[in-house]
Regions:
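Intrinsically disordered, low-complexity regulatory segments
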Residues: 1-142, 155-157, 186-188, 199, ...
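Long, highly charged, low-complexity internal segments
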Residues: 22, 29, 38-55, 148-238, ...
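A generic secondary-structure signal for well-formed alpha-helical elements
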Residues: 95-99, 145, 221, 237-247, ...
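Short, conserved phosphate-binding/catalytic loop or strand-edge motifs used
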Residues: 109-113, 211, 232-239, 244-254, ...
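Core structural elements
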Residues: 132-143, 158-160, 204-208, 212, ...
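Catalytic phosphate-handling regions of large nucleic-acid enzymes and associated NTPases
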Residues: 151, 162-169, 237-268, 289-308, ...
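Accessory beta->alpha helical hairpin/"wing" motif in late/C-terminal subdomains of nucleic-acid enzymes
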Residues: 245-272, 394-429
Length: 455
């Protein structure tokens, strides 16, 4: 980017704005919207979306408009979830000018911010409006259909009652197993496994999604609630070190369990300073994210910044979370450990199973039932568009309070409100998958949505 060109950068969070302003070139001025400056108002009858100005945010809107007049470039860097999309769209409408761009924040390092400022795309507010209206249309017509439950309840029913892809299983004694690859099976299917005697197998440690981190933060007692865990993760993301102004971790709201190719290269160069290059995963084992994916996995920006070296700058809980993320990332980039025991199933050749809770567990055979962990649930619901990473912690706590689900040892089980609808699980799964695809349709009509809902 041309650092002499005056750029107006618009973000959601005042904390982000303060951190980023220190690291940006002097020619970049940052304004935080502090959430919604407008509230969405959807007219289902006319299929129109309006942005109704929040009177308490008048000063922010005024400043955005005034600064935009002087700026050579305007960049909106909000989340890629529906809330972030609405903020980007409403700001673009306020400015009523072409050439507004959108950027994606990957991390709060100086290099990360400069990279974001250079790698921006023209904001297509018409396309954004269509996508937003489609989501509002789907939710509006769903809520008016008396034959359908709450859309989130339907999503949970589809996860627990329909055939899905599983990577976690429980044996007869409640010991949690993991499979080397996902298996397509029914939720009540029994999978018989027996010891593998001919091949050596290894643990599978993948890079971290938001869902994985929140699961671990609650399990490790860094947080009492999942929403608290999400706030803790956000706090860690916004933390910069006093002695260097360096940020600690990458973007905290992501469904990815993979790194970009350039991140793998950076990690490799960093790790060489700590250990041997021979200890790193070979390329064929690396989880590589698509270059056009909005975000990659969560990881420490500098492996040379070890947990013990920053412990004095971090309070207890953020420090413990950083330590956990750091050590998990090291495991995910280095050669996997050999398993003492692994199990196979005749109907799924090439896939092996191993116990997660107790690696000394050994029996001649076992019967495994598919199960859904906290992180599995997040991944599944994100795929159907029901729940994005940014809302996962808060929503999970709400479902627990409502008695829709129970969670024990990270395994999620459905309760009566979900169980009572299991006979329609496949139908809900089909409807939700179809609607999620149609949400990107530029010519989606109410008639099309009604037809899908009635199928």
């Amino acid at each position: 980017m041309n650092t002499s060109v005056y750029t107006l950068l618009i973000v959601e969070s005042p904390v982000l704005a303060r951190v980023m302003q220190k690291l940006c070139p002097p020619s970049v001025y940052i304004i935080a919207t502090e959430g919604f400056c407008w509230q969405p108002k959807y007219d289902a009858y006319k299929n129109q979306l309006k942005a109704v100005a929040d009177p308490e945010k008048a000063d922010i809107r005024k400043e955005i408009k005034e600064q935009a007049k002087w700026a050579n470039s305007v960049i909106i860097a909000t989340d890629t979830d529906p809330s972030g999309d609405f903020i980007a769209w409403s700001v673009s409408r306020l400015l009523k000018s072409t050439g507004v761009k959108r950027g994606t924040i990957q991390n709060l390092s100086k290099n990360g911010i400069y990279s974001m400022l250079s790698d921006v795309q023209e904001l297509d507010d018409s396309r954004l409006e269509t996508r937003l209206k489609n989501r509002f249309l789907i939710h509006d017509l769903w809520s008016k259909n008396r034959n359908l439950p709450d859309i989130q309840l339907a999503g949970l029913t589809a996860v627990f009652g329909a055939e899905n892809r599983y990577s976690h299983f429980l044996n007869e004694n409640g010991i949690l197993f993991k499979s080397s690859e996902q298996i397509q099976c029914a939720p009540d299917e029994l999978i018989s496994v027996y010891p593998e005697k001919h091949e050596q197998h290894y643990t599978i440690t993948k890079p971290l999604s938001t869902f994985d981190v929140l699961e671990a933060a609650k399990e490790q007692k860094f947080a009492q609630y999942y929403y608290e865990a999400q706030l803790l993760l956000q706090q860690l993301f916004q933390t910069t070190l006093q002695f260097s102004d360096d940020a600690l971790i990458s973007y905290p709201r992501t469904d990815a369990r993979a790194f970009y190719s350039e991140t793998w290269e950076s990690i490799k160069n960093q790790y060489i300073k700590l250990g041997s290059v021979n200890q790193l995963k070979p390329t064929f084992l690396q989880e590589i994210a698509d270059s056009d994916a909005p975000h990659e996995s969560i990881y420490p920006l500098q492996l040379t910044v070890k947990p013990q070296e920053v412990a004095g700058e971090l309070s207890s809980k953020p420090g413990k979370l950083y330590e956990w993320i750091y050590h998990h990332t090291i495991k995910s980039i280095t050669m996997p450990e050999a398993l003492a025991h692994s199990y196979v199933n005749e109907l799924n050749p090439g896939i092996y199973f191993y116990p997660q809770q107790n690696h000394d567990f050994y029996k001649k055979s076992a019967s495994l039932n598919p199960c859904t962990t906290v992180s599995d649930l997040g991944i599944q619901l994100n795929k159907t568009g029901i729940l994005k990473p940014s809302k996962f912690g808060k929503t999970l706590d709400e479902w627990l309070d409502k008695g829709w689900i129970k969670i024990k040892n990270n395994v999620v089980t459905p309760c009566k409100p979900v169980l009572s609808k299991m006979d329609r699980a496949r139908n809900y799964q089909k409807i939700l998958s179809t609607l999620n695809r149609q949400a990107e349709n530029n010519s989606l009509t109410p008639e099309t949505v009604q037809s899908i809902l009635s199928s």
